[in-house]
């Protein structure tokens, strides 16, 4: 259900603004989007896994909060994030 360290490093590398950037909202949203996608695939075969569903809702909520922060700071960055990660809003 969680992403591997290699996949996480790859996601960080493709979304980082500079080397060593792991805390920017763009990187955090990318990591959360990857984890959400993995959980969504998990639920296709384990539809009654309500314990993991609660975790999914928490991840979505955290991503939503980060996106709201980015939208408040810079609308263009927000739109780019939505487009890049195919997030509906």
From Swiss-Prot:
Highest rank taxon of the organism: Bacteria
UniProt region (Disordered), positions on chain: 1-24
CDD domains in the cross-refs: Ribosomal_S15p_S13e (cd00353)
Basic and acidic residues bias: start-end ranges: 1-11
Single GO cellular component term: cytosolic small ribosomal subunit
Coiled-coil parts of chain: none
An MF annotation (GO) of this entry: structural constituent of ribosome
Similarity-based family: Belongs to the universal ribosomal protein uS15 family.
A Pfam family of this chain: Ribosomal_S15
Family annotation (InterPro entries): Ribosomal_uS15 (IPR000589), Ribosomal_uS15_bac-type (IPR005290), uS15_NS1_RNA-bd_sf (IPR009068)
Assembly behavior: Part of the 30S ribosomal subunit. Forms a bridge to the 50S subunit in the 70S ribosome, contacting the 23S rRNA.
Entry protein name: Small ribosomal subunit protein uS15
A Gene Ontology BP annotation from the UniProt entry: translation
This protein's record includes keyword Ribonucleoprotein: yes
Keyword annotations: Ribonucleoprotein, Ribosomal protein, RNA-binding, rRNA-binding
Function: One of the primary rRNA binding proteins, it binds directly to 16S rRNA where it helps nucleate assembly of the platform of the 30S subunit by binding and bridging several RNA helices of the 16S rRNA. Forms an intersubunit bridge (bridge B4) with the 23S rRNA of the 50S subunit in the ribosome.
